[in-house]
Amino acid sequence: MKQALAFVVAVALVGGAWFVRTEFIAPTDDPGGTDPAEDVAEQPVTGLAVACDAVLGTACPAGSARLGSQALVDAFSTPDVAHDVLVAPTVVVEMIEESGRSTTTLSDDRRVVATSPIVLVVASGRETDVMDCGPTWTCASSLVTTGDLRPAFADPSTDTEGIAGVAALAGGYFAEAGAPFNLTGFSTGGFIGWLDAVQRESTVSPSGVENIIRFAGSQNDSAVVTEAEALDVTGRAAQNVPVILYPEPVASLAVVAVAVGDADPDDARDVGEQVGAQLRDAGWRGPDGASADGGPAVGEDDGLPSGGVLVALRQRWEQ
């Protein structure tokens, strides 16, 4: 009897979750997302062994190995790297090169094929708190550490979007503290206390924006994600539509395709053009960073620290 009751409850919970998702947020044919596990499609289209950052979702070429940024660092640290082309944001390329573990060379030909700012999505009604003091990442950082803003990130330990989101907030902290955003700054008591507060007040979730909509901000009232994801999810919301903010300085992810080892850079360029077209169709901006929706333009500087600093920030997050 207890087992039967447990089954009924489980079915009810699953059904309720499905109802909330379909009632509040229209479904999409492209889940995108940031699956950190390897996802190899069945039909390669390039004839090349491509490693693709999972933050790019289904824009990754068919047949590519879709990996989170930490898994990419690991994949390029093995004695025999199994990939001809790497498609990822420039910061991930830097993380591989500056990790101290890379076992191969990556081409210097790195043409940007698509960009997306890092944005702060907040539950409707909460945007006033951020707008009143900026909006800046310093303001957002302060609101998080005082418990007045409860953001969600994709997992910073594995995911590009997650570690970039934490880095954007950390940049706000260092700007206010007047301290350098580097390894030296990470060892200060002020930063350690700040990071502890952020981890305490935040939620790790691949569905931060969706959760704002589903639970009307009661679980997390904000999320730090790419603009492309924010526009997609909020555009499908039927109610509890959150607000997209662009704190300054604007941080962004710029996607490149680079040849690995002695692979032909022209082949990497062809892959990049294919991925770039897919990303732009999915709501990413073009290489120039211009916005078609009234958002601020993205400059040449991505507003993020170097790859080596991001590797160290990830290590601090995991401690």
What are these regions (language model features)?
Residues 1-34, 38-44, 262-319:
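Extracellular/periplasmic juxtamembrane helices and adjacent flexible linkers that interface
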Residues 29-158:
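N-terminal segment of the mature folded domain
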Residues 51-53, 144-162, 166-186:
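Short beta-strand->loop
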Residues 55-59, 72, 88-96, 136, ...:
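Stable alpha-helical elements in mature extracytoplasmic
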Residues 87-90, 122-124, 155, 172-177, ...:
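Sec/Tat-exported extracytoplasmic proteins
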Residues 108-120, 192, 237-273:
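Periplasmic-binding protein-like
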Residues 134-145, 150, 155-157, 168-169, ...:
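Bilobed periplasmic-binding protein/Venus flytrap-like ligand-binding cleft at the lobe interface
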Residues 174-247:
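Ligand-binding pocket segment of bilobal, Venus flytrap-like solute-binding proteins
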